[in-house]
Amino acid sequence: MKFAVVGTGVIGSGWITRMLAHGHEVIATDPSEGAYERMLTQVKQNWPYAEQMGLAENASIQNLTFTPHLEEAVKDADHIQENVPEVEEIKDAVLKEIDFYAKPEATIGSSTSGIMPSELQANLSHPERLVVAHPFHPVYILPLVEIVPGKQTSEETTVKAEQIYESIGMDVLHVRHEIEGHIADRLMEALWRESLHIVNDGIATTEEVDKAFTHAAGLRYAQYGPFMTFHLAGGEGGMRHMLKQFGPALKKPWTKLIAPELTDDLYHKVVSGSEASSQGYTMSELDQKRNEFLIKVKELAEQYWPSDSKAMKKSNGAELQ
C-alpha cells in the first residue's frame, strides 16, 4: 500500500515512522521551508524506537520520498493522512486540494484532535471518503487511533479505513457520534482543567499534582481505564457495589471542569513549576526517557491485558445498538 502524508511536523513524522516500520511506501509533502530536513531528522530519531517494537521484513527509511508539491504526493496514494495545523481555514483549503488531486478510490484521514469530520467534509467534492483518524503522540509508539466518520462518510470508507490503520499496528477505536475533542482528548482535558484549578487555588504545585497522578491513578491507568479501575474498587461486588456505596459522592463538588482564567500568575506557576520538574533535562532527553518508558509499559500492559482492536469494536458494539 502506498501512503501519502500531508504535513510533516511531529504528528506527521510520527505517522511516517509507523507506516515505514510496517513495510509501506510513503511519500510526504510539506511546503514549509526546511520541512524535508526536519522530517528526515525526526524520522531517524524515531526509528530506533520502531526497531525496538519490531519492524516488518521489508521496512526501511529508504521507502520514504518527499516532495514540496501536494499534487505529486497524493495523486497515486491509496491512503492520505492530513496533519496540517489545527486551524479550520487551513485544513479546509488543504483537504479540498487533496480531494481534487487524489485518485477516486483513495481514502483520506485527518489527524485533527478536535474538529468534527462533518465540518471538514462540508466543502469537499467527495466527502464520503474522509474520516477523522486521530492518533496520539508519539504516534510510532502509542497504538490508539480514533476513527470518526462524518455525516457524509460512507460505510465502505469507514470499514476500509479501519482495516488500513490496523495494517500499521493501530488499535482502532470507532467513535459512534462525532463530538468536539472526540473521546480521549475530552477525558484528558477534564483532568488538565482540574489540575489547573488545583494549582491556581494554591492547593498544590505542578510537581505535586503530577506526583498525585503518576504515583497512584497513572500507574493503574496504564493497565485499566476508569471503568475497570472503579470496578476493581468495588471489591467482590465490583461496579455494582461501588456505585451503590460511592454513587452519592458524584453529587459532591469534587470537580470544577470549567477551565480557570489563564492569568499571568497562573501562567507563571505552571511554566516555572513544569520547568523545575524537568530537573535540567533538555526536551530531547525528556522525549527519549518518555519513549523508552512507554515501550516498556506497553509491553508490560500487553502481558496482563492484551489489546485487541477487534475485541474492542465487538465489545463497544454489544453495549450500544
Curated annotation (Swiss-Prot):
GO terms for cellular component: cytoplasm. Pathway: Amine and polyamine metabolism; carnitine metabolism. Gene3D superfamilies: N-(1-d-carboxylethyl)-l-norvaline Dehydrogenase, domain 2 (1.10.1040.10), NAD(P)-binding Rossmann-like Domain (3.40.50.720). It is found in: Cytoplasm. Keywords: Cytoplasm, NAD, Oxidoreductase. It comes from the Bacteria. Its EC number is 1.1.1.108. It is an enzyme of class 1 (oxidoreductase). Belongs to the 3-hydroxyacyl-CoA dehydrogenase family. L-carnitine dehydrogenase subfamily. This is L-carnitine dehydrogenase. It comes from Staphylococcus epidermidis (strain ATCC 12228 / FDA PCI 1200).
